[in-house]
Design a protein with these regions (language model features):
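C-terminal accessory region of SF2 helicases/translocases
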Residues: 587-684
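Short, surface-exposed secondary-structure boundary micro-motifs
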Residues: 64, 117-118, 225, 556, ...
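Upstream accessory/linker segments immediately N-terminal to the RecA-like ATPase cores of bacterial MutS
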Residues: 71-252
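N-terminal pre-P-loop "Q-motif" helix
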Residues: 255-278, 292
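Inter-lobe coupling/hinge segments of SF2-like helicase ATPases
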Residues: 234-237, 277-596, 656-659, 684
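Long, highly charged, low-complexity intrinsically disordered interaction regions
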Residues: 1-11, 20, 221-222, 232
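OB-fold nucleic-acid-binding modules
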Residues: 36-66
Length: 684
């Protein structure tokens, strides 16, 4: 007897050849097959009178064949066959290419249902290669048909047949993992009905009922799984830290911290003295002072006898952290080291030795931290910067450097709390919702191409005053013809240097450069050796040049609000007035609304809410960390209400049964373990 783990080759009607084709889509088991959901649907239920047909629409027509197919050859050895179908309202031409093998399929007087796209041809309406079936024996017309994502060698016909065979094979096998009380409370259909109608909807209403059930289940399982991960974290001991006052740290800082920074530090320190490993996200706007929260946690860990590590996504940012933190922490006799992929072998050996013998308190690193030869004597705290560059699995790899270290994650992308659990998984969240005093407001302007000469004159004026300018240009091209990043940016910079700003120094920065090249360009720009830095969005994250007072974004319509806000955050870091100029000629209403928001506020949290409202959570969800189960059917751009429902239901259930050990909840726990297979050991 089959089960959901049965290889699809053993399903009746599929066999070896079709199974090999399905494997290209990641479908190897019966469970994979029924969970391979359609990407859309084609409604073939509406039969229209011929007189009412409009060119461009895909519809069903019921009519009588007016004449046998007439076939003849055309150029290239192809054949064409024609006939006409009539109903009470008019007639429609039917054209078939290369249908010799079916020339007897239609005869005069046959009554059939035809489905296809209507076209105009010399004032007559026609369908080319329509699907057709005898009336009363319909399988692919007169119903809502699924449209599946495909790959080479897999047709819609194959997928439809395979899905039908898969559903027939597992009709009695589908466990309903949702507890009855949850299903009934949220008015959800049974699982068999859901799978049948997500693949082969009986009606648009049945499709909606099925989708609602499956989306809810997916989000409910995800939430329960993450709750179990958090529960597991509470069951292990973290690096021991004693309670102590933070005042000695605060008193020796050269500036006062904001209330929001102190609250975030209190959250983190509370975690560290709890006896459990901290796993906290600290999110705050650009320039809100997240690094000082990290510095406080580093000081607290070192005071408690632990080593610490700070992991940055790029060498530029790692070096910047080192240059900012090392002098600050030296006030507290904390010994810092910078470990990146480009340091020399001798220096690397010395740092590794210092980590192993405990003489280095803080190591600031890029991905080098994850290599096997980096061993710490007593690692107690890991800080990762820019969460979306690292995922659950990478954090797990970091954890292996020590026995469940405290972990603090910094993110400059404010995420609405509704999404935080889904995107950041098992992290607790602290929010820094105020800026340090003196942080410059950046004046922002959204301008069309006609303003370019004035923008260029403004850039010259700033440069003459000794200030510096970022110019960011996105890669412009069709999806399958994206230009070479290096060539595109270099060519644009050359044009600016030779034709627009021959009297200024123009530098180039792009993602194809080697780390040392990027570092050299950024160091030169920070030292004032260039006036203008032309860049791709490599400057989006963390780059700090206080003398840069203007950010010009070309083709600003190609960026999301949150990304534009991150770019704007590269200026306004010094004492001089700063500006952000968004160039775009787009007439799209949504784009204009997005750019208008940028001119109205510098508040990253308001911007993230507007981004969510205008574009849905796709941008946020693109930052979702690796190691969490893939979303197969939920779409958070339209399923936010269901996310709220599912999260509430999951929390209520797990408040009653935190480990899901009650007999009625065990199928749910087993399903969660399957979904979180990469983290299954954490769910034990």
């Amino acid at each position: 007897m089959a089960d959901l783990g049965t290889n699809v080759r053993y399903i009746k009607g599929i066999g070896e050849a079709r199974a090999a084709a399905l494997e290209k889509l990641g479908i190897t088991t019966l469970g994979d097959l029924i969970a391979y959901f359609p990407r859309g649907y084609e409604d073939r239920t509406q039969v229209r009178p011929i007189r009412e047909l409009t060119a461009g629409e895909s519809v069903c027509v019921r009519g009588m064949v007016a004449a046998d197919l007439t076939a003849y050859r055309i150029s290239g050895g192809r054949t064409i066959a024609k006939t006409r179908v009539v109903d009470d309202s008019g007639s429609l031409d039917l054209v078939f290419f290369n249908m010799e093998h079916r020339r007897d399929a239609l005869h005069q007087g046959d009554v059939c249902v035809f489905f296809g796209k209507v076209e105009d041809n010399l004032r007559r309406k026609q369908m080319i290669n329509p699907l057709f079936e005898p009336e009363g024996r319909q399988q692919v017309t007169g119903r809502i048909m699924p449209i599946y994502p495909l790959t080479a060698g897999v047709t819609q016909g194959l997928m439809v047949r395979a899905a039908r065979q898969g559903l027939d094979a597992c009709r009695e096998l589908l466990p309903d993992v949702l507890p009855d009380e949850v299903r009934q409370a949220h008015k959800l259909c049974y699982v068999n009905y859901a799978y049948e109608n997500i693949h082969f909807p009986a009606s648009p209403e049945a499709l909606e009922v099925a989708r609602r059930r499956l989306v809810f289940e997916e989000l409910f399982l995800l939430t329960c799984g993450l709750q179990l991960l958090r529960q597991r974290r509470r069951d292990v001991a973290g690096p021991a830290c004693r309670r102590m006052s933070m005042e000695p740290f605060y008193r020796r800082l050269p500036f006062a911290l904001t209330g929001a920074q102190r609250r975030a530090i209190a959250d983190a320190v509370g975690d560290m003295v709890s006896g459990k490993p901290m796993n906290r996200l600290c999110q705050g706007d650009v320039g809100s002072g997240k690094t000082m929260v990290a510095a406080a946690c580093i000081w607290f860990a070192v005071e408690n006898g632990w080593q610490t590590a700070l992991m940055a996504p790029t060498e530029i940012l790692a070096r910047q952290h080192y240059q900012g933190l090392a002098p600050l922490l030296a006030r507290f006799s904390i010994r810092c080291a910078l470990l990146t992929g480009s340091i020399r072998a001798k220096e690397r050996r010395e740092i590794l030795a210092g980590l192993a013998d405990g003489s280095i308190d803080l190591c600031i690193v890029t991905h080098a931290l994850l290599t096997e030869d980096v061993q710490y004597r007593r690692l107690g705290l890991v800080v990762t910067d820019e969460q979306h560059r690292f995922g659950v699995n990478q954090r797990a790899a970091l954890s292996q450097k020590a026995e469940d270290p405290h972990m603090l994650v910094l993110s400059a992308t404010p995420i609405p709390r509704t999404l935080a659990l889904v995107i950041y998984g098992d992290l607790d969240v602290s929010v820094i919702d105020e800026l340090p005093p003196g942080r410059q407001k950046v004046d922002t302007f959204a301008l069309g191409e006609s303003y370019r000469p004035r923008v260029q004159a403004f850039i010259r004026k700033l440069a003459a005053a000794g200030q510096q300018i970022f110019i960011v240009c996105p890669l412009v091209g069709e999806a399958d013809q994206i230009p070479d990043e290096r060539k595109a940016v270099t060519a644009y910079a050359k044009q600016l240097q030779e034709q627009v700003f021959p009297d200024l120094r123009v530098a180039v920065l792009h993602g194809k450069m080697k780390p040392r090249e990027k570092e050299k360009v950024m160091a030169a720009f920070a030292a004032g050796e260039s006036d203008i830095l032309v860049s791709t969005t490599v400057v989006e994250v963390g780059v700090d040049v206080p003398n840069a007072t203007c950010m010009v974004v070309e083709n600003a319509d190609r960026f999301g609000l949150s990304q534009l806000h991150q770019l704007r955050g590269r200026v306004g870091r010094g004492k001089a007035k700063s500006y952000c100029i968004l160039l775009s000629d787009s007439q799209n209403e949504e784009t204009r609304a997005r750019l208008k928001v940028m001119t109205q506020t510098n508040d990253g949290f308001r911007i993230s809410q507007e981004d969510l409202r205008l574009r849905g959570p796709g941008d946020f969800f693109g930052q979702r960390q690796h190691g969490l189960p893939a979303m197969k059917i939920a779409d958070l751009s339209c399923d936010m209400r269901l996310l709220d429902e599912a999260q509430t239901a999951a929390r209520q259930l797990m408040a009653q049964d935190p480990e899901l050990t009650e007999p009625t909840h065990r199928p749910l726990r087993r399903r969660i373990r399957q979904l979180f297979d990469t983290n299954a050991d954490m769910l034990n």
